[in-house]
Amino acid sequence: MSANRATAIALVLFSTAVAVGCSAHRKQMLAVNSPGIAEKIDVPGISDFGKVNDFLYRGAQPRGDGVEELKKLGIDTIVDLRGELHGLIENERQQAESLGIRFINLPGSGWATADDEQIAQFFSLIRERPRRKIFIHCWLGGDRSGMFIAAYRIAFEGWSPEQAIQEMRSFHYLHFWHPNMARWVKRLPDHLAHSPKLASFRQVRAQP
C-alpha cells in the first residue's frame, strides 16, 4: 500500500470517527435540552388524551363514559374551551357536576386565539394545585387545547415557543388551518412581559 493511499484511508477513518462522535454529542444535547412532551394515554371516551404532568391533563371532548373515566383518574376540574354547541356543553356540565367534578367553560372560537382574561383564569387554576387535577379540552383536543397548554409550558415551565409548538403538533395541531395560533404562541413571551392582565404570572414556575 502506498504512503499516499494509507494517509487517505487514515483521514477517512478519522473523519468518520469525528462525525460519529459529533452526531452522538448532538443527540445527547437534544436529549438534555428537549423537554418531554405530554404522555399519550389511552382513555376510553376521550381521544388525544395526554398527561402533561401529575396535575394537568389534556384531550378532546369526552364522549360516552369519558367524564366517568376522568373521575376514575382523580380529575376534579374540567376546563372546557368550546364556545359552540351550547347544549353539549351543558350536558357535560351536568354530568361532571353529578360526579363532583368542577366544570369551567372558557368559551372561544376554534378559529381565534385566547384572550388575556381566559389565560389568566386558566393560570389561576394552575396556581391552586396541588388541590386540583385539571383536564382541559376543546372539540378535537389539538388546537385550542394545544394553545392553552403551550401558554402553560412557556409561563410555568420556561419552555421556548418552538418547544411548545412542537408539542402542539404532536397532538394534531392543524397549523394549515390555524396558523394564527402558532403566531400567538411565538409572541407569548413578549406578551407576558407587557400585558397588565397577566402581570401576576410573569416569571412564575410550577413547583416540583
Listing of model-derived features with the role each one plays in the protein:
Residues C138:
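Short cysteine clusters
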Residues G141:
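Substrate/cofactor-recognition hotspot
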Residues R144:
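Glycine/aspartate-rich loop-and-adjacent alpha/beta segment that forms the canonical ThDP
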Residues F14-I134, M147-P208:
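Cys-dependent protein tyrosine phosphatase-like superfamily
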